């Protein structure tokens, strides 16, 4: 029986884990039509709510005692601070050296406080005033290539974009962030 499956995916999952997963799915269920929506929580949650998405793969919603969606953790991965190769801070070895940096993050606004807590406050750092949120990985890549902004990418995305996009993972001593991926 043919059917349709609508899936929301975060940009970095779309570039790393989605292609082989889709190939395996298509081998087992070739008659099912797939529809993909790229987006963070702000994009996928309304579609999950109205039923136009069957599920999403990405960062889980912030912890809440009353969650409207059931989510199952799939895996976690570490992240890295990235910049263009010739960035003035490309050689920095500590997050403290990045306290005055300008950031562009491909993260959902709902995650902003937990990001600030996990990345900056727990290390005794002040939260930078210039954390820009971008709802597009293409926007982040463009800004990283042509400005002095920094970003944080999960390692699987670092591995597929560094050479191609002329980016550099800063050799920091600290662990930057652990990203949980759930369905």
Feature map (PLM): residue ranges:
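Central regulatory/effector-binding core of bacterial HTH transcription factors
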Residues: 2-63, 133
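Hydrophobic residues within well-ordered alpha-helices
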Residues: 7, 47-49, 98, 142-148, ...
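Ligand-binding cleft/hinge of the Venus flytrap
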Residues: 21-28, 52, 113-127
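Acidic, Gly/Pro-rich loop/turn segments at junctions of secondary structure
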Residues: 28, 39-101, 157, 174-177
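Conserved functional loop/turn residues at catalytic and ligand-binding sites
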Residues: 33, 47, 51-52, 73, ...
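Secondary-structure junction motif
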Residues: 59, 89-93, 101-124
């Amino acid at each position: 029986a043919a059917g349709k499956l609508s899936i929301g995916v975060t940009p970095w999952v779309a570039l790393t884990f989605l292609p082989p997963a889709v190939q395996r799915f298509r081998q087992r269920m070739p008659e099912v039509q797939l529809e993909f929506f790229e987006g963070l929580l702000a994009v996928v949650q309304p579609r999950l709510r109205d039923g136009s998405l069957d599920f999403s793969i990405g960062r889980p919603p912030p912890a809440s005692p009353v969650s409207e969606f059931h989510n199952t953790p799939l895996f976690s991965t570490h992240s890295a601070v990235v910049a263009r190769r010739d960035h003035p801070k490309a050689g920095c070895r500590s997050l403290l050296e990045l306290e005055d940096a300008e950031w562009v993050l491909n993260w959902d606004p709902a995650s902003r406080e937990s990001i600030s807590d996990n990345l900056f406050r727990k290390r005794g750092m002040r939260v930078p005033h210039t954390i820009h949120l971008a709802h597009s990985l293409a926007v982040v890549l463009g800004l990283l290539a042509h400005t002095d902004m920094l970003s944080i990418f999960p390692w699987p995305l670092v591995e597929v974009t560094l050479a191609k996009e002329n980016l550099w993972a800063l050799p920091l001593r600290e662990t930057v962030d652990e990203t949980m991926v759930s369905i």
